[in-house]
Amino acid sequence: MDYTKDSGSTTAQRRQRQIEECLFTSLLQRPYPSVSISDLCHQLGISRKSFYNYFPDKDACLQAIISRKLHTCIRNLRAELAENPTEEQIIASYLSYWKEEKNLLDIIVRNDLLSLLEDQCIRFLREDEQHLLSILDTPQLQTVNFVLAGFVSLQVTMILQWHLQNYQPLIFRKGDN
C-alpha cells in the first residue's frame, strides 16, 4: 500500500509528513529497532491512535519515506528527460539525486534495510506496469517481474556500494565486463 497518497486533507497530509520526518530524524540518531511508535508519538505530542490513523506500523512509515524519495527521484528525471539529455547526463542526474539522499542511504545501510528499499523500488516500478510491458515488448508478467527484480537489485546494490565508497567517481569504459 502506498501511504504517500492524498490522505484527504491538507492537515492530514501535513501530519503524515510530520510523522515521516520524525521517524527519519530519529533514525539519523538511533538504530531502527530502538525507535518505537511511542517515542515518535511523544516527540510529536500525538497519541498512538493518531499515529495508527496514518500508518499501520513503523515499517509502513519508513516505506512511505522511501516511496516519497523514489517519486521525487523519478519526477526529477522526467523533468530532465523533457530537455533531451544525453545518457551520461541522465545517469549523472540519477546518481546526483542519490548522493543528495546520503542520510537515507546511511539509515538503510546502518539498519540493514536493503530488502525494504528493494521492495519499495519494485513496488514503485510496478505502479506503471503496463508502460513497462510496452517498453519491454513482452506480455509475460513473470518475465517482467524477473527483469524488474534483477534491475532493482542491481541498481540498489550499485547505489549502496557507491555510497559505501564515499561517492568515489564511477568510471565506465567500453569493453569492461
Where in this protein do the model-derived segments appear?
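Basic, helix-initiating cap at the start of DNA-binding domains
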Residues: 1-26, 30, 39, 43
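Alpha-helical structural segments
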Residues: 14-25, 43, 60-80, 89, ...
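Alpha-helical residues within helix-turn-helix
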Residues: 36-39, 60
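Short hydrophobic/aromatic patch on the recognition helix
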Residues: 45-55
